[in-house]
Structures are given as structure tokens and as C-alpha cells.
């Protein structure tokens, strides 16, 4: 199948909300069949998640309160990528800020594109 036949083209775009962390946009798009439709989506700067293994082989987790669900969770260290920041620098910074640990060795494990599911 030719993927080009699936592409939606942006006709217009407007901000709905601009916050400190994320931005909500509403776009009017031209569908492959020629009709138009609205798409609402969230722009996020990206984030890293750190899978830190201690010398004893245990994984490092932290407890975080998440306001949106009013609960404390056990989570892997993570954080958003600042503008112009390399993801590895973000990972180093977040590990140090959130846990007090620094890693002597880093290995990139992969990338997940979460925004495709919004």
C-alpha cells in the first residue's frame, strides 16, 4: 500500500492552550478523500526515562506524588528534555536531581514515540 494516500495535510493550526510544559493545538486538516476534519493534539518537548542498575544488581526506583491522580507512585527516574538539551544530558541531570545518584556508564536502550497514540 502507498502510505502517501494516508497522509493528512494541515490547512490551518491554532493554539488552544499554552502552558509551561505542554501546548494544545487544534488543526484543520485535509483528509486523503478530500474532506476536511479537526485534529486536537498535545505538543510536548519530549522526555527521558532512566533504567538505573545499582552495583548490587537492583534497579533504582523513586516515589513520586502525581497530582493529576492524587496518588504516590513507584517510578523509574524520568524528566522532560529542556530546549536545546541532548537526551543523554537530560538523563544525567534527572538521575542526579531525583535520586542523588550519578552513573559511571550509560547505554541507550531505545526510543518510544508516545505522541503517535494521542
Regions found by a protein language model. Give the residues of each.
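Extended interaction-bearing regions that mediate binding to partners or small molecules
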Residues: 1-17
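A short, polar/charged loop/turn motif at coil->beta-strand junctions and beta-hairpin connectors
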Residues: 4-5, 18-23, 70
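Conserved Nudix-box catalytic region and its N-terminal flanking loop in Nudix hydrolases
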Residues: 5, 39-42, 48-93, 97
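Acidic, metal-coordinating catalytic segment for phosphate/diphosphate chemistry
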Residues: 12-49, 55
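Glycine-centered flexibility sites
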Residues: 19, 34, 46, 78-79, ...
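Active-site segment of metal-dependent pyrophosphate-handling enzymes
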Residues: 23, 45-46, 53, 66, ...
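Hydrophobic residues on conserved beta-strands that form the core of alpha/beta folds
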Residues: 24-26, 38, 62, 76, ...
